[in-house]
């Protein structure tokens, strides 16, 4: 019968016993239960040991390092007896200068070279089958392992793409499975992606790099976990004259513990919630229960109705959470703002919108995302000066591109949004509208008093309409009255419950509709929600696909980029200098929507930041 080598405290000599035997004492044990856990071996020259150890430490998801042998103990006599085995099965792949040159049943012929080599003991994935069972799902045959285009963090010559394994999961079982995986496997059990394989750079699941073909039945969601077979690419990348690695599917059993082993009972900071954030391409994201609850608290805070407009009827649960999750995955964001409600004044813009947009820009900059603002062409000079002043006064870190769009056709919108007009390569991943005039069903644009301001508004709505048909571009609308771009998602409620709603309701829908008593508050809340997500260990690991080091919660650059009473007072002061008026009263002064900055807005900003940065 096949034999599984149990490696306990005598790891070095046991490895020697393992690799010098001509008997195949390794077998696939990924679904075995008990205290022992499966692991694979990588054998490298001693000179590369420190670099490979560090490479594993900065890519712990796919490469959980359990231990390594001490070179001087390689030649200790083997301890214990090896039980009867089948003969002749290969156990190792041999690598020479980065190329796999053959498979070996033993390393006996390399005993001299092994004196100056180190064996690394890498934890294999926890038992997915056990997690499936715990979540009430049937066990499935082990699937293949696919190479992604996600790069591991490079260190001293070791560089390779992440390799993943997949299981198809019914939609209604996703959260239960993810929680079971995290409970059983801790950080190692958390998936790195749920949704379209192409978001990982996997073109065909049916053609894995290792193992059997992977198939995802219709109606189920492909869920991916990091694979320890990532180590094979690392071994190849270093191009050392001689190295060895366990053949895929072959493991040894050990009682060595991962330093990041599951705690047994998950705390709210580690219990994951699963959220659907995109249908085309299919994409789910996760955040911890505690992070999600914080963001829900922000949503509740900004949802008050100081103007008694009836916005409570427009509120949709978790829109702020889903919008911020989607934004966190975006690489490039385009933000639009500007509502020329004061059509008899110059400039006609109001003080609601630009501060919220700039606050979001500031935080996206801190996250090192590409970000640009798009405005009406007639208001380009105004917004250019506002941004320049914001940089000069420290509200923004650096200048950002300010774009315009004149429209004309569906083709023009697609050409603007995509590189060379190709919908396969969008320039932006996410569009955000904050207090931006939105097109009504009759094609006009109305302020809250039902005055048509179409002559002052460029057709930026067309970009949101085009984005609906371009896979990979999501959108968010932030509004406080229902006539703002993106509020088409709640247009029926606007028509029923908002004054003049039957006329002014925006007809253009965003994927996510964030409703706030003042739209600026929605911009502040999006920035705060991103801070919460990036400080969440569960979401952060998912976002970086379990490769690379994590950043400490409350990173100083992120904290400094959050909205603050001081920065927002400066921002409103900049608008006042440029004669921008309050939306309700028309006053040029320190107020937004007829509400004074000191007391009302300052208090809201401080409350949002306090909730955001509070320790759980």
UniProtKB/Swiss-Prot annotation:
Entry's family note: Belongs to the D-glutamate cyclase family.
GO annotation terms (biological process): glutamate metabolic process
Domain of life from the UniProt record: Eukaryota
GO molecular-function term, one example from the UniProt record: D-glutamate cyclase activity
PANTHER family attached to this UniProt entry: D-GLUTAMATE CYCLASE, MITOCHONDRIAL
Record's protein name: D-glutamate cyclase, mitochondrial
Organism per entry: Homo sapiens
Alphabetized UniProt keyword annotations: Lyase, Mitochondrion, Transit peptide
Record Pfam families: D-Glu_cyclase (PF07286), GLUCM-like_C (PF14336)
Locations listed in the record: Mitochondrion matrix
EC id: 4.2.1.48
GO annotations of cellular component type: mitochondrial matrix; mitochondrion
Transit peptide interval: 1-28
Annotated catalysed reactions: D-glutamate = 5-oxo-D-proline + H2O
Main subcellular localisation: mitochondrion
EC primary class: lyase
Function: D-glutamate cyclase that converts D-glutamate to 5-oxo-D-proline.
């Amino acid at each position: 019968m096949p034999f599984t080598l149990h490696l306990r405290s005598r790891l070095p000599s046991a490895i020697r016993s393992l690799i010098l035997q001509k008997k195949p004492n390794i077998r696939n044990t990924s679904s075995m239960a008990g205290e022992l856990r499966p692991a694979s071996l990588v054998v490298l020259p001693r000179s590369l040991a420190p670099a490979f150890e560090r490479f594993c430490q900065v890519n712990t998801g796919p490469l959980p390092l359990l231990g390594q042998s001490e070179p001087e103990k390689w030649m200790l006599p083997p301890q214990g007896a090896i039980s009867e085995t089948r003969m002749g099965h290969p156990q190792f792949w041999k690598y020479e200068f980065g190329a796999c040159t053959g498979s070996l049943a033993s390393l006996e012929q390399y005993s001299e070279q092994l004196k100056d080599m180190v064996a690394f003991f890498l934890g294999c994935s926890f038992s997915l089958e056990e997690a499936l069972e715990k979540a009430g799902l049937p066990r499935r045959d082990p699937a293949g392992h696919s190479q992604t285009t996600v790069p591991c963090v490079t260190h001293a010559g070791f560089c390779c793409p992440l390799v993943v394994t997949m299981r198809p999961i019914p939609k209604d079982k996703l959260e239960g499975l993810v929680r079971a995986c995290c409970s059983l496997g801790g950080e190692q059990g958390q998936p790195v992606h749920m949704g379209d394989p192409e978001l990982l750079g996997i073109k065909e699941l049916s053609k894995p790099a290792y193992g059997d073909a992977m198939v995802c039945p219709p109606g189920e969601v492909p869920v991916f976990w990091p694979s320890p077979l990532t180590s094979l690419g690392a071994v190849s990348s270093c191009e050392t004259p001689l190295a060895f690695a366990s053949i895929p599917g072959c493991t040894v059993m050990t009682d060595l513990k991962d330093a990041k082993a599951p705690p047994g009972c998950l705390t709210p900071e580690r219990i994951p919630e699963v959220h659907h954030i995109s249908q085309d391409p299919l994409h789910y994201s996760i955040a911890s229960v505690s992070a999600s609850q914080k963001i829900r608290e922000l949503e509740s805070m900004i949802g008050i109705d100081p103007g008694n407009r009836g916005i409570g009827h427009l509120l949709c649960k978790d829109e702020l959470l889903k919008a911020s999750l989607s934004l966190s995955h975006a690489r490039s964001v385009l933000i639009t703002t500007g509502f020329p409600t004061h059509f008899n004044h110059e400039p006609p813009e109001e003080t609601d919108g630009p501060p919220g947009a700039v606050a979001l820009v500031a935080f996206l900059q801190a996250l090192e995302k590409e970000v640009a603002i798009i405005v009406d062409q007639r208001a380009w000079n105004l917004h250019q000066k506002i941004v320049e002043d914001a940089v000069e006064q420290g509200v923004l870190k650096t200048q950002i591109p300010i774009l315009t769009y004149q429209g004309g056709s569906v083709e023009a919108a697609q050409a603007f949004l995509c590189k060379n007009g190709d919908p396969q390569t969008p320039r932006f991943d996410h569009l955000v509208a904050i207090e931006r005039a939105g097109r009504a069903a009759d094609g006009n644009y109305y302020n809250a008093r039902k005055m048509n301001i179409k002559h002052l508004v460029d057709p930026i709505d067309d970009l949101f309409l085009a984005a609906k048909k371009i896979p990979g571009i999501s959108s968010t609308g932030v509004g406080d009255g229902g006539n703002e771009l993106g509020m088409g998602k709640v247009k029926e409620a606007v028509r029923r419950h908002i004054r003049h709603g039957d006329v002014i309701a925006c007809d253009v829908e965003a994927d996510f509709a964030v409703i706030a008593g003042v739209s600026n508050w929605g911009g502040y809340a999006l920035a705060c929600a991103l801070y919460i997500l990036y400080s969440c260990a569960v979401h952060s690991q998912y976002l970086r696909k379990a490769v690379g080091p994590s950043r400490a919660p409350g990173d100083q650059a992120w904290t400094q980029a959050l909205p603050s009473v001081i920065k927002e007072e400066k921002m409103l002061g900049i608008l006042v200098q440029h004669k921008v008026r309050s939306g309700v009263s028309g006053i040029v002064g320190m107020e937004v929507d007829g509400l004074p900055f000191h007391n009302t807005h300052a208090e809201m900003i401080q409350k949002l930041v306090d909730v955001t940065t509070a320790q759980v």
